[in-house]
């Protein structure tokens, strides 16, 4: 109707200019509105031989300054950063924006049984809101001094990635950056819900490594 009004007023109107560019700029909002799910970005660091780490109990740095700065830029551009219980326990991260300018994203942890200790940084630093996704079979939505607990449906005794994303969308979250470990990453890949992937590859191999990067890029993915 707006175009019609302008044309009747004698104003020349061009429709569809830079349409694809506009879609890319608004991709997270468009998906949130049309599908009820956030735009999902996965970030993973790997060794030259494709391993994310030694094992699930050990934290190891694989990236350099440039890739870390890019990771913080990604954090500054999304509504929320998502990790799993194991990453929260081992790294005790804050998931804040550093090295670049930007606001801290919301922090989301997938913790099926709500067993994470409330002494973690994510529950105490007050730098951003923290959400814990837990099983809807055992818990109800609860807001506490430390975080907001959001119940999510289970599939095969694990939280459903699709329902997790729909739950976050209802909280107004339109974009999510996954920084979780192998298990979280694999579950979201298998659910087919990842829209964009960034892989940082270190110029070294890991001896005796067990955590293989689950991402196997098909021809559908552009590099």
Q: What are these language model-derived features?
A:
Residues 1-21, 106, 187-189:
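Zn2+-dependent cytidine deaminase-like catalytic core
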Residues 20, 32, 39-223:
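Enzymes that bind and transform nitrogen-containing heteroaromatic metabolites
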Residues 25-37:
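Flexible, polar/acidic helix-loop-strand segments at domain edges
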């Amino acid at each position: 109707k707006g175009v019609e009004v302008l044309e009747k007023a004698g104003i020349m109107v061009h429709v569809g200019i830079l349409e694809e560019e506009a879609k890319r700029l608004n991709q997270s909002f468009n998906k949130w509105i049309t599908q009820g799910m956030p735009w999902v970005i996965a970030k993973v660091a790997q060794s030259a031989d494709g391993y994310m780490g030694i094992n699930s109990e050990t934290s190891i740095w694989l990236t350099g300054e440039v890739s870390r700065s890019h990771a913080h830029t990604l954090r500054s551009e999304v509504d929320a950063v998502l990790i799993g219980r194991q990453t929260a326990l081992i790294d005790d991260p804050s998931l804040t924006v550093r090295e670049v300018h930007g606001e801290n994203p919301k922090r989301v942890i997938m913790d099926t049984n709500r067993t994470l200790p409330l002494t973690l940084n994510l529950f105490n630093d007050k730098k951003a809101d923290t959400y814990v996704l837990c099983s809807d079979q055992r818990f109800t939505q609860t807001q506490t001094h430390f975080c907001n607990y959001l119940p999510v449906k289970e599939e095969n005794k694990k939280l459903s990635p699709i329902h997790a994303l729909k739950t976050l969308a209802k909280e107004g979250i339109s974009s999510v950056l996954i920084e979780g470990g192998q298990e979280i990453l694999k579950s979201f890949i298998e659910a087919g819900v990842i829209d964009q992937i960034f892989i940082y590859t270190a110029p070294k191999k890991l001896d005796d490594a067990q955590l293989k990067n689950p991402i196997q890029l098909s021809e559908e993915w552009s590099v």
